Regions:
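Transmembrane alpha-helical cores of Major Facilitator Superfamily
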Residues: 8, 43-47, 74, 102, ...
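A late C-terminal transmembrane helix in Major Facilitator Superfamily
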Residues: 122-159
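Cytoplasmic membrane-interface "Motif A"-like loop-to-helix N-cap segments
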Residues: 61-73
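Multi-pass alpha-helical transporter architecture, strongest
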Residues: 174-205, 210
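C-terminal ends and interior cores of transmembrane alpha-helices
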Residues: 75-90
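A membrane-interface helix-boundary motif in multi-pass transporters
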Residues: 152-177
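Extracytoplasmic gate region of multi-pass secondary transporters
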Residues: 1-57, 112, 116, 143-151
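Hydrophobic core of transmembrane alpha-helices in multi-pass small-molecule transporters
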Residues: 94-110
Length: 210
């Protein structure tokens, strides 16, 4: 259940960026970002999403899965908190905004790619498929909750004739909070107690005909 929370928080926060990436960069830097450039930004995030799966999964082989998620949530919380400061009425830095968003999305992809190995480390290879199938409900749930959070807040600002640009810091700070929750859940993950290990004779043989 702790790993469910870990994956849910990581994916929800990542979707919070992907869900509204193009409008977000245009609203952050009004009049400076064309629609075509915003589309290119979304394409760049897709590349970092894919690259992050290779990079972070490989790094986890050296750092360990728990330590890798420690980086995801610690760095993620800092980046989500910092991202609103890049907008036009603050630092006004498009390159910094793009760089931060790209790193966040790389960790979103990396978290999804690293979780099967995390499961194997905790439960052994024999149980990974069944447990991973259940864990994917966290991804499905995050795919619903993430857009609900983002669109719910944006709709509130638009319907009340408020400045839409002011909605994004609130959204990103919620994602920062999710990073903190995920950090705590990951911190509490412990190896399975030896008393729950399956005896070797109880494992079904694997081979032709099975």
């Amino acid at each position: 259940y702790l790993l469910w929370i870990v994956l849910f928080c990581n994916v929800t926060a990542g979707i919070g960026i992907l869900e509204d990436a193009s409008p977000m960069i245009q609203d952050f830097f009004k009049g400076h970002i064309l629609a075509a450039a915003a589309g290119g930004f979304v394409g760049l995030l897709s590349i970092f999403n894919m690259a992050g799966r290779f990079f972070w999964a490989s790094m986890s082989d050296f750092l360990g899965r728990k330590a890798t998620y420690f980086i995801f949530f610690t760095l993620g919380a800092i980046l989500f908190f910092t991202l609103p400061l890049t907008r036009g009425d603050h630092l006004n830095s498009v390159p910094l905004f793009v760089a931060i968003a790209a790193v966040i999305i790389s960790m979103y992809g990396g978290g999804f790619a690293t979780i099967p190995a995390y499961l194997k480390d905790l439960f052994g290879g024999y149980n990974v498929s069944a447990i991973h199938g259940r864990l994917l409900t966290a991804w499905s749930t995050a795919g619903i909750v993430g857009p609900l959070i983002v669109n719910g807040i944006l709709d509130h600002y638009v319907s009340n004739h408020l400045n839409k640009q002011d909605a994004y810091p609130q959204i990103l700070h919620i994602m920062c909070g999710l990073m903190v929750v995920g950090f705590v859940a990951n911190l509490l993950v412990r190896p399975v107690a030896e008393k729950h290990w399956m005896a070797e004779q109880n494992l079904a043989p694997v081979g032709p005909g099975h």
